[in-house]
Amino acid sequence: MKIALDAMGGDFAPQAAVAGAVLAAQRLAGKAQVVLIGSEAEIRPLLLEHGPSATTLEVVPTTQVIEMGEHPTKAFQQKQDSSIAVGYRLLHSGEVDAFCSAGNTGAMLVGAMFTVKAVPGVMRPAIANFVPKVNGGMGIILDVGANADCKPEMLEQFGELGSLYAQYVLGIARPKVGLMNLGEEEGKGSVVTQAAHQLLKVNPHIHFIGNIEGRDLFDDKADVIVCDGFTGNVILKMAESMYDIMEKRGLNDEYFARLNYETVGGSPILGINDNAIIGHGVSTPRAICNMLIQGYQMAHAGIVDQIKDTFKS
């Protein structure tokens, strides 16, 4: 198995990317190989700094980089030898089993939609992220940014995608799916959330427990939290800020430490034909390492095949 990394993606690339890749290669030894994609002239000297064993990592050379500020679609189309474009081609051809990048988020979404494409039957892929539960374990929230406006049918599908990830990757036998809303009652919320509630309620593929509120986010009420990308992104950034506040105030707490984005490393794009993960632009070596390990976990669990089978029916 091969897990690929865009070595040129992120604010601290390629240094942080290479360091994270070396850490991941050590932790995945005997399970999967880490493949670096990017400027070989920059990557090789950095690998050498990490010792002889690091120099054995495979490097796929590229000559272009999609910068953070570039227009995603235009850059992806014009820079076909960029680390992101090449990464997606390797993923689509089956040469690697997962592709991770802390680079341009928009370009990662463009590549997901136009190179590997959505699973037949999926209206719109979603970006997911993770919610540490107070009593231990992890929940999943989606969408967190790919789709600011959603149709009820899209929210229903997010419930299915999240439930499959929770079951097959997180190991939750019967994931509880909750719809983020402004009240628990069935008739609460916008026209979209009310309609989505009715669809989720009768969906045979999920265990829907009804509406949940913001205060339920971190408890065990729901394992899968469904929302549109606008709401999900606000929730995600707010949760990340809680960790930042704790750190600035010098407060150490095991639970709040789990809100640190580094612990999971990245956000999977669910509903596409291959495994792709988007990392934080400020990703550290630890975050890069955990993103690659998450890529391995997704590939090992066969989550894409599970999604394809579900949406085939």
Which residue ranges define each predicted feature?
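Glycine-rich phosphate/nucleotide-binding loop
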Residues: 113-127, 133-141, 218-313
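Short glycine/serine/threonine-rich phosphate/pyrophosphate-binding segments
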Residues: 13-17, 81-94, 98-112, 119, ...
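N-terminal glycine-rich anion-binding loop in soluble enzyme alpha/beta folds
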Residues: 13-70
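Glycine-rich phosphate/diphosphate-binding loop of Rossmann-like nucleotide-binding domains
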Residues: 15-16, 28-35, 41-44, 148-210, ...
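Short, glycine-rich nucleotide/cofactor-binding loops
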Residues: 4-15, 76, 146-156, 278-285
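Phosphate/nucleotide-donor binding subsite
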Residues: 52-96
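Glycine-rich phosphate-binding loop
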Residues: 90-109, 184, 188, 193-256
